[in-house]
């Protein structure tokens, strides 16, 4: 089949009345889009669009490198990461770089190296972006047919999809190799309060790993967010990487089935909408993961989860009052329930008081005190270790609550500290970004479907107030 790259189609979108402004030689008349429509002007210019994407990647990687070095420059080893407003160093520490037992930072040089590598990479990407945006060929189809494409060429589109899937699969395997062979990763569950270790006994059982996908998202079930051991996380990445690579090969070798050709819209804007929907889902899942999961996001680096801080408070006061002579097994609280300990709906012994709602929390500082029926009274009396007391007291005062002005903790607490948890920032930002990506998906999906149906006209601007106003210039 002859490639269709010469068939230029411009959607008749009506835009602002000032169509004279031209950027990089592409104005509204020749492209059908005004300057503020950004990459829409490049829909049919694959070379220029490549430049825009490479330059965008350069900006992303530059931010990563610069922010990384900024965090290294401001890092104080004596304070926990989550007290310092860090969001990048906790990720590097979770990968096992620069940390030792208990999550203590013993070497910041790997963090410096990471920042420099990202800055160098961003320079390469930035040069490539400028080259392709300004100097390279406008279209790739004639000179480099392998990299050229036509949005309507379904076979080429699924080939590109396949290449992307293979790259994602290789990315998943990078984590696997780091955990298995290159120094290991940080395991918050390692005995005695967490340590870096190599993963030796991968979970590859499909019933276990795909069982997470079949769990309820509610309560103590928690869907995939409930994963709480590294063997499952790394084993899951083996499966994900394999599925992505095999799926990528399949998409490269095959053509779309007839039902897919009929059901999907095959245009650049449609692909944009699909991508935005996927990123939106990723954002919402990441939000839940960083908020609730203390295995993939260890509390040593990100601060405690909300339930963890609450349970830590109950534990701290249980320890204090038990030392003062209270019988924590039988003391009654103001509601008639147990003051320190009570029973869950399913019969386990749990912490009493307001924290009862978080009874299904699992945390490495607390699990050693559980028996077959929940919290074990004899262990609470005899086996509490100093590191558990220290950690729970620390977590109690660093709950992931807080306002934009950084006055953290409970709003009514007179001893509030100048602290906002990275969990708050990361969960909130990913929720907000996930929401806006979803709105972008709806917007572009609607436009793509309308264009495919043949009635895309843009917004009718005949009665727009701006038309009757004096131009600003």
Curated annotation (Swiss-Prot):
InterPro entries: PS_antenna-like, PS_II_antenna-like_sf, PSII_PsbC, PSII_PsbC_sf. Gene3D superfamilies: photosystem ii from thermosynechococcus elongatus. The modification N-acetylthreonine is found at residue 15. Binds multiple chlorophylls and provides some of the ligands for the Ca-4Mn-5O cluster of the oxygen-evolving complex. It may also provide a ligand for a Cl- that is required for oxygen evolution. PSII binds additional chlorophylls, carotenoids and specific lipids. Keywords: Acetylation, Chlorophyll, Chloroplast, Chromophore, Manganese, Membrane, Metal-binding, Phosphoprotein, Photosynthesis, Photosystem II, Plastid, Thylakoid, Transmembrane, Transmembrane helix. One of its GO terms (molecular function) is electron transporter, transferring electrons within the cyclic electron transport pathway of photosynthesis activity. It comes from Oenothera argillicola (Appalachian evening primrose). The lineage of its organism: Eukaryota, Viridiplantae, Streptophyta, Embryophyta, Tracheophyta. It is a multi-pass membrane protein. GO terms for biological process: photosynthetic electron transport in photosystem II. This is Photosystem II CP43 reaction center protein. Its main location: plastid. NCBIfam families: psbC (TIGR01153). It is found in: Plastid, Chloroplast thylakoid membrane.
């Amino acid at each position: 089949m002859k490639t269709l790259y010469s068939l230029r189609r411009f959607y008749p979108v009506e835009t602002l009345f000032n169509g004279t402004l031209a950027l990089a030689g592409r104005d509204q008349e020749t492209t059908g889009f005004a300057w503020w429509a950004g990459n829409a002007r490049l829909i049919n210019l694959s070379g220029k669009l490549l430049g825009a994407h490479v330059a965008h990647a350069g900006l992303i990687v530059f931010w990563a490198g610069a922010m990384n070095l900024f965090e290294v420059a401001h890092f104080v080893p004596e304070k926990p990461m989550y007290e310092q407003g860090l969001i990048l160093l906790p990720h590097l520490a979770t990968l096992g770089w620069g940390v030792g037992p208990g999550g203590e930072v013993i070497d910041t040089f790997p963090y410096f190296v990471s920042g420099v590598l990202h800055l160098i990479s961003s320079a390469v990407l930035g040069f490539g972006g400028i080259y392709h945006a300004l100097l390279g060929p406008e279209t790739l189809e004639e000179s480099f047919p392998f990299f050229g494409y036509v949005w309507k060429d379904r076979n080429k589109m699924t080939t590109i999809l396949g290449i992307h899937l293979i790259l994602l699969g290789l990315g998943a395997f990078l984590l696997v190799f780091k955990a298995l062979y290159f120094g290991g990763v940080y395991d918050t569950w390692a005995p005695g309060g967490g340590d870096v270790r190599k993963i030796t006994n991968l979970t590859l059982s499909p019933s276990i790993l795909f069982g997470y996908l079949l769990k309820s998202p509610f309560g103590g079930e928690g869907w995939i967010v409930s994963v709480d051991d590294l063997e499952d996380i790394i084993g899951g990445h083996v499966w994900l990487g394999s599925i992505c690579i095999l799926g990528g090969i399949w998409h490269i070798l095959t053509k779309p089935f007839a039902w897919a050709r009929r059901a999907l819209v095959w245009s650049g804007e449609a692909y944009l909408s699909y991508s935005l929907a996927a990123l939106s889902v990723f954002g919402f899942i990441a939000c839940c993961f960083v908020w609730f999961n203390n295995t993939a996001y260890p509390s040593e680096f990100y601060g405690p989860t909300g339930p963890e801080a609450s349970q830590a408070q109950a534990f701290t006061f249980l320890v204090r009052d038990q030392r003062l002579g209270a019988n924590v097994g039988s003391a009654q609280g103001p509601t008639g329930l147990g003051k320190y300990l009570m029973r869950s709906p399913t019969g386990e012994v749990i912490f009493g008081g307001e924290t009862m709602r978080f009874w299904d929390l699992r945390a490495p500082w607390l699990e050693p005190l559980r028996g077959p029926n929940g919290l074990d009274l004899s262990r609470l009396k005899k086996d509490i270790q100093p590191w558990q007391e220290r950690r729970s007291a620390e977590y109690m005062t660093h709950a992931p609550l807080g306002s934009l002005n950084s006055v953290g903790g409970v709003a009514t607490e007179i001893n509030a500290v100048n602290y906002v948890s990275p969990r708050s920032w990361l969960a909130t930002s990913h929720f907000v970004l996930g929401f806006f990506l979803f709105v972008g998906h709806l917007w572009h999906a609607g436009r793509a479907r309308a264009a495919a149906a043949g009635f895309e006209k843009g917004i009718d601007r005949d009665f727009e107030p701006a038309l009757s106003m004096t131009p600003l210039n």
